[in-house]
Amino acid sequence: MAARRKARKRALDLLYEADQKAVSGGAPASGDAVALLAERIATPHGEAPMREYTVEIVEGVAAHQARIDELLETYAQGWSLERMPAVDRAILRIGVWELLFNDDVPDAVAVDEAVALAAELSTDDSPTFVNGLLGQLLRLAPVLRDEEAAAGG
């Protein structure tokens, strides 16, 4: 468990950094995340080796980011992606990817881990927001998964 939690945290760091670079530079965040991941793997700068699950998360979020962001925009009542704290955006992207696109993670674990990251790293209101939004998507997950399967995603 601790290994996956560390992998999520590192993926969050990469997704957050890529998102911030995209905001300041105008480049698409998903491509930046994969490029940043490749850069960190190639030149680790004294960091521990990249965990396999970190790579899987970053690549998975990047591959499905358009759909993930569409779902977040649709179900985050009153919140646009741009209005969300950047850390929450990255946490939610990981959570949605784990819920809908990664069969290896139990749904409850995906939500719990996202809420734990929000509690540790974001605002006081973030855990409730993340829990509520992912909880709503969790209730819709069977239908959303069927839609993804039908669309070939």
From Swiss-Prot:
Sorted UniProt keywords: RNA-binding, Transcription, Transcription antitermination, Transcription regulation
Keyword Transcription regulation set for record: yes
Gene Ontology BP terms: DNA-templated transcription termination; transcription antitermination
GO cellular component terms listed in the entry, alphabetical order: cytosol
An MF annotation (GO) of this entry: RNA binding
InterPro entries (alphabetical): NusB-like_sf, NusB_fam, NusB_RsmB_TIM44
Pfam families with a match to the protein in the record: NusB
Function: Involved in transcription antitermination. Required for transcription of ribosomal RNA (rRNA) genes. Binds specifically to the boxA antiterminator sequence of the ribosomal RNA (rrn) operons.
Family to which this protein belongs: Belongs to the NusB family.
HAMAP family assigned: NusB
Designated name of the protein: Transcription antitermination protein NusB
Organism expressing this protein natively: Beutenbergia cavernae (strain ATCC BAA-8 / DSM 12333 / CCUG 43141 / JCM 11478 / NBRC 16432 / NCIMB 13614 / HKI 0122)
Gene that encodes the chain: nusB
